[in-house]
Amino acid sequence: MTVTKKTTKKTAPKKTSKKTAPKKTTKKTAPKKTTKKTAPKKTTKSLRTKVICISHKEDNDGISSAALIRQAFGGDAILVDYPGQMEALYQVVTDEKLKSLFICDLGLSKKTQDEFIDILTTLRKNKVSVTYIDHHDIDPNVVKALQKIKVKVIHDVNECTTVQVYNTYKSKLNDHASFVATCAAITDYMEDRPIGSKLLQMYDRQFALISATVLTYNIVGRQREPDYLLYLVEELSESKFPHDIPNTFEFAQIQVEKLSQIIAKVKKGLKTMSKLGHMEILDSGASGAVNFVMGLSGKDVGVAYKERVDHGIYAVSVRGSANCKVHLGRIVNPLATSLGGSGGGHDKACGAVVPKAKIKKFITELNKKIK
């Protein structure tokens, strides 16, 4: 009997069953795994779903443009200054999920325009929908080149970018979007233009002015806080008034106090040439000080410049008074480019990026070109 037991153990059918278990064979040839590996349709669909808006981060027009694009189309915003403009475009051109790209309130210079066209050409070859919305002075040949590759160009120097976004896509926007556009027009000094003026008439003027001003101080004062700027885009896209966004008025008051201190510093540090006043700014943004430089110098043109140590350049703001007879943007664009930088903008308000070693020459040459 003992022998029988041993024999039984050796030939136990259970062990044989485990070796030839059909379940294991089924797992190896499971069609589900094969389906996952070869399912191209699901992968292809997920590639082209993303909407991105690249917009100017330094003023209300850029932030508000991004907010209205977000309200109309959803998606994400990438906020940049001019030195970071091309870097952002290179970032999105490799994004295989990108479906639609909006570029707002970012003017082009002679230095950047060819590169801009090349990048957008690549995007269009990848079947990405591209819309460029702006109001800065632009070379007509650039517009033709963009239209040739089927980029949708919305461009009018007579209205700020947000107003153009609103006017183009208002069927996709809610009623509050008109107020966002109104505030942007005010802060870009374009509330007297055909569409901008009609929008302003819809609201109490003082209410719109204080809202636009508070928004501007929060944007200018938080340039080193990218998450906050994106938060503002979200809040504005959700139809929040500036006074509904926590601490905006309190922060604006702090910025006003700082600006009042700049007046005394400008009086002490500003320099003049025959046609312009200029000053290097050390402890605030150049754009916030440039109007004081112009006004206190008694000249029709003011230039404020601040070093960007991380880029080895100066960020330059240029402003002209009502008496300024030249188009500053058209002078600054080729001048900055000839010195290895870039620039451009409007007739009485523009900016430039100039290599650190060339800032003195930039100011001297600009002074010569002002009639």
Task: Name each model-derived stretch.
Residues R48-V93:
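Anionic-ligand anchoring segments at beta-strand to alpha-helix junctions in alpha/beta enzyme folds, i.e.
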Residues I52-C53, L68-F73, A77-V80, F102, ...:
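Catalytic phosphate/metal-binding cores of nucleic-acid and nucleotide-processing enzymes, i.e., regions
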Residues T4-K45:
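Intrinsically disordered, polybasic Lys/Arg-rich low-complexity tracts
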